[in-house]
Amino acid sequence: MADNEPLIQPDRGQDAISLHLVNRDGFPEWVKKLSTTQRTALEAQKFEGSGYQVGIVPDGDSWFAVGGVANPAELSSWCMAKLAEALPAGTYRRAEGEPGPAVHGWQTAQYVFDRYKQPERPVGPRVLLTKDVGAIDNAIAEAKAVCLVRDLVNTPAEDMGPAALEAQCEELAKAHS
């Protein structure tokens, strides 16, 4: 998770790539709205609307993404995580509806443990926009907490002894007191 740029930001109408969420049952009806070229692109990617599938669809000089989820009307914490992993860096917004609890998986899917080695080909942040501005701060805090725990778990014991754990606890206490 990037420290310098929040991965969840307020939707103020800025440019963003559309994310369409479909399920396997609703996909046949949804795909009828697309052009032949767009349907062919999804067929080439073997996209059927199954959970955690990601498709890229050409749209004139641009494109949009489609993700398979269990229920587009009731998103879970993890249903958009695969999109955050698979899509290129950029700014995204749901085409219909708000991401709701899926902001958690969107953020934590971008976690990279890079304390000892930098990624060979780092991927920039995938920012998700939401109109639910009141939920952003809590969602970011929760994702940061998860990523901190992942860092602690991924740090070898030789670098995370009692003194290092104490220092981490002191840092947290100072930040939140």
Give residue spans per PLM region:
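N-terminal hydrophobic/helix-forming segments and targeting peptides
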Residues: 1-177
